[in-house]
Amino acid sequence: MKKIPSFLQMYSALIASPTMSSIDPHFDQSNRTLIELLANWLSSLGFRTEVIPLEGSRDKFNLLATYGEGEGGLLLAGHTDTVPFDEGRWQFDPFKLTEKDGKFYGLGTADMKGFFAFVIDAVSQLDLTRLTKPLRILATADEETTMLGARTFIQHSHIRPDCAIIGEPTSLKPIRAHKGHVGEALRITGKSGHSSDPSKGINAIELMHEATGYLMQMRDELRQKYHHAAFNIPYPTMNFGAISGGDAVNRICACCELHFDIRPLPNLRLTDLNEMLQAKLAPMFEKWGGRISLQALHDPIPGYECAHSAQVVQVVEKLLGEQCETVNYCTEAPFIQQLCPTLVLGPGSIEQAHQPDEFLSAEFIDPTRELLSKLIGQFCTG
């Protein structure tokens, strides 16, 4: 068995490999180099590695590494990409792991490339020949944009682990449920003309005013109809995030576009939500036809919930001595959950994610190593 780098050497190498994902091709980057790093390290530890190209991506890949045979066992999962960074707001080099005052700075230190350094370091300290069930490690692409990596993996994967842990930054607090995310663009095409005679045009802003009234009715109905007591905000939310329209004060507005999102609870199916949205805007479609269009800004992400009775929930709560929680942000959990019961649990704080001078506190290092070793022992040694 070959010797692998130290924890900090691996951590540094991961941060030094840029893997930003973005809808904008100018900022979007391949994760090939990082995937190859992980594959080489895990191969050195005796894992079988499979690098999986993602069709329809810009040179993106998943990695599945397996030690052992058969079904069951544990899947440790995470994404390899980061969001882009605002160069003017960073004091530290985003691609150089920098330790200062008990904090490790760098893009992806917390969210979440650093998790793979923790996993490989923990695995390297174990006697893997004692495993009686397989240990799998999954590294995905494009979580920060389309979740293409996780979506593709579940479509083609035949593995059935006993459970999965996604190492997103949760401050080592277990998460067993979160809301989903639906982003929509409502576009209204009017008819321009001189503002001195509004009757000769169709004002898209006025139509949008009418449409937002229907959407606000739907927002109130969602709040009344759906409830989940485990969430701090126990109902689905709707937010009008961006609007644009018109080009001159003396012209009838010919075009107006609204971007809004809905965060459904786990008990609200995406098909039901879409039907509700179409029905609520039906009067607009019937009256104005092709002047009204509704298009998804991204593939919808469903809500996610792992039953409290699941073995992984019971084991993790006992190991950590605390109850699982819920959050309002999204992860790949709704997709991995289709394979097996899944928890979100990892080092670092979500408060540092997507922030300038992202960091992971050194206080997470030893507890994370210990927790990963216990989880592998619990689920892979029978």
From Swiss-Prot:
The active site is at D81, E143. It holds the Pfam family M20_dimer. This is Acetylornithine deacetylase. One of its GO terms (biological process) is L-arginine biosynthetic process. It catalyses: N(2)-acetyl-L-ornithine + H2O = L-ornithine + acetate. It comes from Pasteurella multocida (strain Pm70). The keyword Metal-binding applies. Binds 2 Zn(2+) or Co(2+) ions per subunit. Its EC number is 3.5.1.16. Homodimer. Its cofactor is Zn(2+); Co(2+); glutathione. Zn(2+) 1 binds at H79, D111, E168. Keywords: Amino-acid biosynthesis, Arginine biosynthesis, Cobalt, Cytoplasm, Hydrolase, Metal-binding, Zinc. The gene is argE. It comes from the Bacteria. NCBIfam families: AcOrn-deacetyl, PRK05111.1.
